[in-house]
């Protein structure tokens, strides 16, 4: 019996360490939440909190017959390598983006009621790994300084859909593409109510829940970086509504703040936000689960304090916005140095979609 137990422990050890891991090139620190795409634009995988690639990743890339894999993370340069190079590499290194951000000048805060954040958003939804919907545009967020409630108003947008992709049935459509809502955990005040912290170094803290690492707070070039896993396969969220069964087993958020203080961060100094969600869905128990994933990003362009809000019509968050509405190509030049274009494979897939005008 002891021999069997030792064998199980040994095999578990070997199997866990056979997983590839993604590291920061200069510091050899593991990178969580790296998205991995095929050369056809399919989202194949997302690394976990410790930077490990999932154990079934190699089976996935073999089934897709991709020649290359592309690694995407908002804090690092996009990297593409061949399948041969991937299999011959023990670890994958990504190079950090070196970015000097300009200070955002804001108006006097006396007597104001709202904070307005104007920025560029983009959102893509995957159906069984393939791009299905795409929205991007310019949006104003209005945040009440008294209640914290947030309203959003889209000024311009583009809308694309791949109509060849089918969802659960002709009657059921699951869509979370569109303007994202800022998560409550983007503020220090809220995050400390649920999580604890452990100091890793002078520039890094790990974020813990039930003594398990769920993310990190890092300072870098006078900015603060937040990375947090809210839901994963180990702590998924299951829901049922109108006969629909869903499981949220991937929900990660990342953010950058104009602050190097690990205590002083909230929406007033937010300059970048990203989230990725993954759902398993089915209409009834006889069906197989369908896989839906969506990424949302927001890049701050302007910040202003207001006494009142002029707009009176607002958008619903996580709702596909159509048709396209714009006077000029707002997407050509984004005035936020954190902005990186999508990998070419994903851009090509979006360009093959039909724009809804």
Give residue ranges: language-model regions.
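Short beta-strand/loop motifs in extracellular/secreted proteins, especially
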Residues: 31-35, 67
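Short Pro-Gly-centered beta-turn/loop motif in secreted/extracellular proteins
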Residues: 54-66
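Structural motif
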Residues: 19-32
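Bacterial Sec-dependent N-terminal signal peptides
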Residues: 1-22
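Short, acidic Ser/Thr/Gly-rich low-complexity loop/linker segments typical of extracellular
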Residues: 42-56
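Surface-exposed, low-complexity/disordered segments
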Residues: 89-357
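Short amphipathic beta-strand segments in non-cytosolic proteins
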Residues: 34-46, 106-110
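A short, solvent-exposed loop/turn motif at the edges and junctions
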Residues: 68-81
């Amino acid at each position: 019996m002891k021999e069997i137990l030792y064998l199980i422990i040994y095999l578990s050890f070997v199997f866990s360490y056979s997983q590839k891991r993604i590291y920061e090139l200069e510091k050899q620190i593991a990178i969580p939440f790296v998205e991995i795409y095929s050369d056809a634009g399919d989202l194949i995988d997302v690394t976990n909190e410790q930077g490990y690639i999932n154990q079934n990743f190699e089976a996935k890339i073999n089934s897709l017959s991709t020649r290359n894999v592309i690694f995407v993370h908002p804090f690092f340069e996009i990297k593409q390598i061949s399948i041969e190079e991937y299999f011959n590499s023990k670890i994958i290194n990504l190079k950090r983006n070196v970015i000097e951000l300009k200070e955002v000048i804001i108006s006097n805060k006396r007597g104001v009621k709202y904070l307005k954040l104007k920025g560029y958003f983009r959102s893509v939804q995957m159906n069984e790994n393939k791009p299905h919907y795409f929205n991007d545009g310019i949006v104003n967020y209005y945040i009440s300084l008294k209640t914290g409630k947030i309203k959003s108003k889209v000024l311009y947008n583009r809308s694309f859909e791949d109509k060849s992709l089918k969802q659960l049935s002709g009657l059921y459509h699951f869509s979370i593409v569109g303007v994202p809502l800022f998560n409550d955990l983007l503020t220090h005040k809220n995050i400390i109510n649920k999580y604890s912290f452990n100091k890793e170094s002078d520039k890094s803290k790990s974020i813990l829940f039930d003594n398990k690492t769920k993310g990190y707070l890092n300072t870098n070039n006078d900015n603060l970086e937040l990375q947090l896993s809210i839901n994963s396969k180990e702590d998924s969220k299951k829901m049922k509504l109108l006969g629909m069964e869903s499981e949220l087993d991937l929900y990660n958020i990342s953010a950058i703040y104009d602050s190097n203080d690990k205590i002083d961060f909230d929406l007033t100094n937010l300059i970048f936000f990203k989230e990725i969600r993954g759902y398993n869905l089915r209409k009834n128990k006889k069906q197989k689960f369908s896989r839906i994933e969506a990424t949302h990003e927001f890049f701050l362009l302007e910040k202003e304090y207001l006494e009142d809000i002029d707009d009176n019509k607002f958008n619903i968050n996580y709702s596909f916005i159509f048709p396209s509405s714009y006077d000029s190509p707002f997407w050509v030049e984004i005035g936020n140095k954190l902005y990186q274009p999508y990998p070419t494979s994903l851009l090509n897939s979006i360009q093959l979609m039909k724009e809804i005008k």
